[in-house]
Amino acid sequence: MFEDYLEDSNYFAVKASKTNNERESKRYYRAAVFCTMSAVEAFINYVGDVLSQAEILQSYEVAFLTDRKFDISGGTFQILDQMEYHKLEDKLKLLISKFIPDFSFDKTPSWSRLFELKKLRDTITHPRQDVDETDIAEYRRILTTGLSSAIEIMDSLAKGVFKRPLRKKLLDLSVTDNV
């Protein structure tokens, strides 16, 4: 599913860049932002599901990645049969720390750019104003760097977890300047 979302994001970004109608352009950019962040979340869920079968991680790490509630009862770790959603940022940090050991959260530009996109997504999802005040150039900038950064991080994780990169058609979305 994450692949479809990445392609959808690129599709909407291209549509946004080709229209002269500001309202329509913002509509497409918002859709692209949602699709990009949904792609990241879907990818993390996919990785978590695969790792839950692989017995590579500790049970509490798998529970965390797969949004399972866990507890310590009587000094014993237990995975409960309940959902408990965990922050995307925390899941990414866990996976990156495990599978991309040389990744620097402070120095890798893709990390801050991805979370700049997430911040925009959160602003759209939980608006504090009546009107979308983000201008077209800002949408374009944040989405262009955010989509590219999402793909870069996902590709690095794919190489670390699966020992192979993302498909070329996805990698090409980050290098073409269609947006």
Model-derived regions, located:
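Terminal alpha-helical segments
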Residues: 1-17, 47, 51-55, 59, ...
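Long amphipathic alpha-helical segments
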Residues: 53, 133-134, 155-179
